[in-house]
Amino acid sequence: MTFYQELQLNQAGSKSLLKNSKTMKEKLYHTFVYMVKIAVTMVFCFAFVTASSIILGKDNSIVGVVVLLCVMVFRNADLGIHTRHSTWLLALFFVIMTVCPHLANQLSPLPALLINIAALAVLILFGCHNPFMFNQSTLVLGYLLLYGYDVSGKSYMLRIAGMAAGAAITCLVFYRNHKNRDYKRNMKAVIQEFDLSSSRTKWQLCQILCVPLVLCIAQLCNMPRAMWAGIAAMSAILPFMEDMQYRVRKRIVGNIAGVICFTVLYFLLPPSIYAYIGIIGGIGVGLSAQYGWQAVFNTFGALAIAAESYGLKGAVSLRVIQNVFGVVFALVFCAVFYRIMSVKAPVKEETV
């Protein structure tokens, strides 16, 4: 494996190489490559998001985050269907992420619920045909981030321009990297494989219904940062209940640990560098291969932003409440939903 090829590995792949190193020299080399990868990734991400903020305005910095996330994920990940169809679908997904979150923010919670369900139905059914690719962690997360950081007026016009450019970049990178791959499915096949007896379809329906419902309840209860609860629910919903229970435990414990660590840093560090706590969290996520540790470090960035608006106490309270509510509601909802669907139609295992 070349130096460049090793740089392309994810955290789990890099840590596997480290674990299986036979000599100290080999382990030091893999450690060096891993640290270079983290450094290069952080510098690139920081530069990309900073540039997008300068061009599109500070209110649209989240556009840079969403576009960067899509490019980095879909340069390797696929949708499981023909490349040409997938490319058009990616363009459609960007349209949905640009229009629907903004439209939902203009409506009261109940009409917004319907908009969110319709939008997530397209993203999940066509973008997340293989649950184990975890494309929902890109598409639904991107949707929720844009929903949570909505803008209006001139800023929204700039957001449209930024998302259009992001769609073009993502589609070009995706097509270039996947054009020579063969896929058996097309868009019609994806629709035909929708089956209420399959574990995949049940999981998709849980995502489509539960996440918007969590957002709606959070809004009806006047809970700020409703997107946090939605993101927590999305992250916890998996095809199998045993996996969900594990995720829920790790999410709750990870967020509480993250809140404690953030609070310690908040009091130890001078106010002038509070904004950089989020970068520390980003580095931590890059070094983490396990979901529990990722939950810890993901808390840093969210709290660094929220603390500016709500203060430390308010941000910490919101983070814990929203995350516990999101994952617990998702667990209960999916347990009931899976039970009802299993009674109506026996589980059918499928090849994804």
Where are these regions (language model features)?
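Alpha-helical transmembrane segments and their membrane-interface boundaries
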Residues: 2-137, 141-300, 304-352
